[in-house]
Amino acid sequence: MGDYIVVLEAPIIVKDVESVEEAIEAAVNKVVNALEKEKLDFVRVELGYSKCPVCGAHFESAFVVGNVGLVGIYLTLKVFNAQSLEHAERIAKAVVGRALKKSH
């Protein structure tokens, strides 16, 4: 049994946004509120980054089309007493996923 730090990436859809900055703010707020409702304030929430396949530069994982935003969010948490890294990932997905599904 071991302790593992698990990083999950979640795609968050937000509506009625006009800019990337607004989409990022709305997505982060949505995730933080969902986690706080479930008393999961120990989960670190960060904006995701993508890598350009052409030049290799990193950019914020946020896109807006037709007032709908898609934002990639990284969720980091420590899982205690897991049997393996895969087990820790399953635990993290179950705990965080349950909280995010309730927020829809």
From Swiss-Prot:
InterPro entries: UPF0212 (IPR007564). It holds the Pfam family DUF555. Belongs to the UPF0212 family. PANTHER family: UPF0212 PROTEIN MJ0068 (PTHR42199), UPF0212 PROTEIN TK1194 (PTHR42199:SF1). This is UPF0212 protein PH1312. It comes from Pyrococcus horikoshii (strain ATCC 700860 / DSM 12428 / JCM 9974 / NBRC 100139 / OT-3). The lineage of its organism: Archaea, Methanobacteriati, Methanobacteriota, Thermococci, Thermococcales.
